[in-house]
Amino acid sequence: MTKYKLEYIWLDGYTPTPNLRGKTQIKEFASFPTLEQLPLWGFDGSSTQQAEGHSSDCVLKPVAVFPDAARTNGVLVMCEVMMPDGKTPHASNKRATILDDAGAWFGFEQEYFFYKDGRPLGFPTSGYPAPQGPYYTGVGFSNVGDVARKIVEEHLDLCLAAGINHEGINAEVAKGQWEFQIFGKGSKKAADEMWMARYLMLRLTEKYGIDIEFHCKPLGDTDWNGSGMHANFSTEYMRTVGGKEYFEALMAAFDKNLMDHIAVYGPDNDKRLTGKHETAPWNKFSYGVADRGASIRVPHSFVNNGYKGYLEDRRPNSQGDPYQIASQILKTISSVPTEKKAVA
């Protein structure tokens, strides 16, 4: 038997953006534990905005498990928060009620800033560095500094070791801004892995004395890009049948449900979605081929393949909850009728 360090991780009850929480217990197993072997656990909900002090018990229900390469015999356990009966989802538990479809594929592009001493990493003590231009996918100390790349490479390795479907990294448009991409089949799986990747980044940067800033527009109304979490999505029907008529009906549905999407695409999006810095205005829906200034970017490959494949919704922001984002996208897609065609 081996003693494993089980890190139970969950989302707290803070609004509009939940925080990640985690605590460790030690359990013995003959080998790396399966999800079915992991027990329910409890925590003090009165300290996480999820209960009152006079009745503070909440329950953690494991829903996904990953190896933790940062610890000897480490296990990362993604959890849903349940009421004391262990069966009823807590009001803050969005995962329990979202739409899911294994045939729906999601690729999230998580942008963020490294922050040190209250400002983006690489910014001078006062004022600003050289304007945007050389930082996006840049190399060299003057562009990315001396520690950021070390962190993103270490984070990449931690994600891959955990079995997270991490698909890439790059320096972003603003100084101190980076991005990583997570892909998953099914909204719950994709979102589980994105939340776990966020957790690993936050935990990793502790030892560097650096914070992660997920706010979508941390530098305010300046000529510096904000941060998004663009959502690339497709369903089996979009990939195998599609067609221009279906695509146009789909875009009409996204237009009709504009405000439902904005409501779950992350707080303060009006500060980011201004029509500048590769964004579309938050209150107007648009789409265009290869257009990074549109609400939805349509890849050339999608059109060239007979309007089949994936699309990119560029409106979700860097603080958005991937559970709710994926669910809303599926909800809108499900409102559009599909022809009953055989899939070749």
Curated annotation (Swiss-Prot):
Residues 4-86 form the GS beta-grasp domain. The lineage of its organism: Bacteria, Pseudomonadati, Pseudomonadota, Alphaproteobacteria, Hyphomicrobiales. Catalyzes the ATP-dependent biosynthesis of glutamine from glutamate and ammonia. It is found in: Cytoplasm. This is Glutamine synthetase. SMART domains: Gln-synt_C (SM01230). It catalyses: L-glutamate + NH4(+) + ATP = L-glutamine + ADP + phosphate + H(+). It comes from Bradyrhizobium diazoefficiens (strain JCM 10833 / BCRC 13528 / IAM 13628 / NBRC 14792 / USDA 110). ATP binds at E167. It holds the Pfam family Gln-synt_N. It is an enzyme of class 6 (ligase). Two forms of glutamine synthetase (GSI and GSII) can be found in this nitrogen fixing bacteria, GSI is a typical prokaryotic glutamine synthetase whereas GSII is similar to the eukaryotic enzyme. Disulfide bonds: none annotated. Residues 89-344 form the GS catalytic domain. Its cofactor is Mg(2+). GO terms for cellular component: cytoplasm. Its EC number is 6.3.1.2.
